[in-house]
């Protein structure tokens, strides 16, 4: 049987407008993990991983698939705003949400996302 532990790339988004994004690489993640538990794990990693100091002040609450390997990358470099069906459901496992090996997942504040989606303009 195939090993269910995978590497995932988490794109922690502090600011949509300024494209303040930092990748967090997580290894040996069980894809059968519930999304709400996974969010807690990622939030803990942000608090304890060196280099994430500017990202520690936000209360990240949402996850959305940015890119699935061998799939099409979105046009927007900050977040996938075209496909709202890519949001991860808290009540399902990562695998049930379509997460596979080396999937890139955006982790962000929903309120900031909704503002950005109304006017997806970059300030810089």
UniProtKB/Swiss-Prot annotation:
Question: Does the entry annotate any disulfide bonds, and if so which pairs?
Answer: none
Signal peptide positions (record): none
Superkingdom in the source lineage: Eukaryota
Q: Check the record and name the InterPro entries matching this protein.
A: UPF0538 (IPR018794)
- Entry's family note: Belongs to the UPF0538 family.
* Name under which the protein is recorded: UPF0538 protein
